[in-house]
């Protein structure tokens, strides 16, 4: 895909590495943070059924979080579809930093807006 090609080029320039993992359990194993997003963003509603099938098995739930590192946090940019890409228990659980993330994003957006308006 064009996105992968662009990323691969940047990785090569930086002498880094990239790994594509298709098994969510292997992907989160030992992770300090697990980040998820909706499967179909606004404007992609017509692709919802196709994406649900493609991402089946990738719901961030309690079992998946057991594979992550001790103390791992979970993040989501919101809005979320509970029970689809993330379980309600994980979203509202003690490892969730989702609402802190949303609050911090709000403050960052306010600061940017103030700067763009001349520091009002």
PLM regions: where:
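Rossmann-like adenosine-cofactor binding region
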Residues: 13-88
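Adenosine-phosphate binding glycine-rich loop
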Residues: 71-72, 78-120
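Short, well-ordered alpha-helix to beta-strand connector turns
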Residues: 8, 30-31, 94
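Single conserved hydrophobic/aromatic residue that forms the stacking wall/gate
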Residues: 1-8, 12
């Amino acid at each position: 895909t064009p996105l992968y090609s662009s990323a691969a080029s940047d990785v090569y320039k930086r002498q880094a590495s990239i790994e594509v993992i298709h098994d969510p359990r292997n992907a989160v194993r030992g992770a300090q943070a697990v980040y998820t997003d909706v499967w179909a963003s606004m404007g992609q509603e017509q692709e919802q059924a196709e994406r649900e099938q493609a991402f089946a098995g990738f719901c961030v739930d309690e079992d998946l979080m057991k594979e992550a590192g001790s103390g791992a946090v979970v993040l989501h940019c919101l809005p979320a579809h509970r029970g689809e890409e993330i379980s309600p228990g994980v979203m509202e659980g003690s490892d969730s930093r989702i609402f802190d993330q949303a609050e911090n994003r709000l403050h960052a957006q306010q600061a940017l807006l103030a700067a763009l308006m001349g520091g009002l």
